[in-house]
């Protein structure tokens, strides 16, 4: 009897995993993608140490770069919260988070997406990644007094770099 119950439980779990996976695959990722900040606003506030796209900004609207401080190399003073937040590019590559379509990462994808480019399989991957980042927003809301920008500065910088409003 124990073996049957265990097998039934395992089969039920596998069935639930399949159902959940199917639901996730059928989600309209474009409907759930609701970034709170535009690329322009993110850069105005200060992200990625001011080192955007290796200074190759020609494919993006010039208006995005008004009131934006740009640096040839990463400069932590240009980040909104004056902290380093995130992992190295090498780590991104090792984790498989860099794709040939956007070799500079999520922000490059997001800028191109905002400019109208659609590559469905890439959009799905990047929107899933963006959605998973919401946990950091929830951590700030749970652990910080509203408006205390000194609380969890690294997480605030991180959510800013994922188009979430850090002023919570």
Indicate where each model-derived feature is located:
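Compositionally biased, intrinsically disordered low-complexity regions enriched for acidic
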Residues: 14-101, 105, 117, 135-158
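Charge-patterned, phosphorylation-rich low-complexity C-terminal interaction regions
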Residues: 160-168
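Short linear, low-complexity motifs centered on an aromatic residue
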Residues: 113-137
């Amino acid at each position: 009897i124990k073996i049957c119950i265990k097998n039934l439980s395992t089969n039920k779990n596998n069935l639930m995993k399949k159902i959940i996976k199917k639901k996730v695959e059928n989600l309209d990722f474009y409907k759930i993608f609701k970034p709170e900040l535009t690329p322009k606003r993110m850069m105005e506030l200060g992200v990625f140490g001011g080192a955007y796209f290796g200074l190759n900004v020609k494919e993006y609207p010039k208006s995005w770069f008004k009131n934006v401080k740009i640096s040839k190399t990463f400069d932590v003073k240009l980040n909104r919260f004056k902290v380093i937040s995130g992992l190295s590019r090498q780590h991104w590559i090792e984790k498989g988070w860099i794709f040939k379509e956007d070799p500079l990462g999520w922000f490059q994808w997001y800028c191109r997406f905002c400019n109208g480019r659609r590559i469905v399989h890439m959009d799905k991957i990047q929107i899933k990644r963006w959605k998973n980042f919401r946990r950091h927003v929830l951590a700030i809301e749970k652990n910080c007094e509203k408006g205390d920008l000194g609380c969890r500065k690294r997480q605030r910088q991180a959510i800013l770099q994922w188009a979430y409003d850090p002023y919570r």
